[in-house]
Every structure is written in structure tokens, then in C-alpha cells.
Design a protein with these regions (language model features):
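Bacterial C-terminal helix-turn-helix
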Residues: 1-6, 13-79
């Protein structure tokens, strides 16, 4: 049976490639970049799982509904 790599391993491998691709350049804002790139697909997937119900999605994520709404707007995931 094949098991999928966990999310942390996927992120680690992508960071290794990211730093390799920089070819010695010093990056800026890596923390925010990673959070934003992980957060958007997470929010999109959870919203799909919840059929667009923000209250249900917020509960699933452990966020306040207003916080979720702010993040959805930030990532342009709301019309």
C-alpha cells in the first residue's frame, strides 16, 4: 500500500527547491509567502467541502466566521 507524503514533507521539499532555484540570492518574506501559498488552497478546498457555507467552513477550520471571510476576500475567493 502506498501512503501519500504528509503536508509538512511536501512543503519542505518545495522549500528546498525554492532555495535551490534562488541560486544564492537572499530571499525576503519567506514566512508570509509560504503562509499565503498554503492558506489559499486550504481555504478553497474547505469551502468546496462545505458547499460554500462559511459558518461550517469556519467551524471546520477553527476560525471565527469574520476571520474566515476576511481571509477569503484577501485571497479573492469570494465574488
Amino acid at each position: 500500500m502506498h501512503t501519500a507524503p504528509d503536508i509538512a514533507d511536501c512543503i519542505r521539499q518545495n522549500l528546498i527547491q525554492y532555495f535551490h532555484d534562488l541560486n544564492g540570492e537572499t530571499p525576503c518574506g519567506v514566512y508570509e509567502m509560504v503562509l499565503l501559498q498554503v492558506e489559499k488552497p486550504l481555504l478553497a478546498h474547505i469551502m468546496d467541502e462545505c458547499g460554500g457555507n462559511q459558518s461550517k467552513a469556519a467551524e471546520m477550520l477553527g476560525l471565527n466566521r469574520n476571520t474566515l471571510r476576511k481571509k477569503l476576500l484577501q485571497h479573492k475567493l469570494l465574488d
